Amino acid sequence: MTSNDGDRSNGDDDGRPHGDRAVLALAREDWRTAADAYVQAAFATFAGYEGFGYGAFGDRTEVGVAVAHLCRASVCHRLADATGRAQNRAAQGALVAADAREHVATERVDEGACEELVGVCRVLADDPDAATAAFDRARDAYADADVADPAGATTRPVHQAGTDLLTHLSRPDDVAWDDVHGTGGDALARRVRFLRSKLPEFVDARVRDGKLHAARASTEYNTGYRCPACDATDVNYHSPAVLCLRCSAVVEAR
C-alpha cells in the first residue's frame, strides 16, 4: 500500500515516548513522521501508557490530551499534503470527544470542554457548519453549568488540554491564557468566542507557512545557546531536546 505523504516511517522509536518523537519530528520538519508519532501518542495516552498514566476513563481523564494529539496529527498531515488523512484524524478526534461528552464527563462544564474539542476537530475536518454547532453547544453547556469560578474551571483536565492545543497552534504568535480567557468573570464564554473566531485563522496560518512549531514549554531568553539554523539565542526546553524558540530547530539533543 502506498502513501501520498512521504515514505513510511521505519518504526525505530529509540525507546522514546511517542510525544517526544513527535517533537523531534517537528524540529526536522518531517511532517509524516510527526503525524504518525502524534497518532501513536494519542492512543498511548488514551490507554494510559503515556502522559500521566490516567488514561481516558478515570476521574483525572486524559482524553483531552489524546484528542489534542489527534488534532496535531491532523495539522501535520496537512503540512505533508495528505488532506484526506488530515480529515480522518480530525474525524477520529471528534468521535472520541463526543464519546467522552456522553460517557466520561460527569458535569456540565466538562461536557462543554468536550464540545469545544468536537468543534476544533470539525474545523480541522473542513466542516465549518458542524464546528459552529459544536461551539454553540459548548457555549450553552457553560451557561447551564453556571460555575462559580469560570477562570478556575479552565484548569480542569479537558479544558487544560484544549488550552494547550490552542496555544500550540497559535505559535509562533504565542497567544497567552489572558488572550483566550480575558480578565473578567466570563472566562469560559470568552474562550468559546476566541476558539470560534481565531482557531481557523491559526490553522490557515500554519498551513500557509508550511510549518507547525513545537509547543512552547519552559523557555529562556538570551542564553549561551545559539541556534544552528537561525542564530537565535532564545530556547525552548523540551524533554527530548533543547529547541530554538524562534524556529524550533534542535539546538542541543538530550
Language-model segments: residues:
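Alpha-helical protein-protein interaction scaffolds
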Residues: 14-150
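Structural signature of alpha-solenoid helical repeat scaffolds
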Residues: 57-61, 65, 81, 104-106, ...
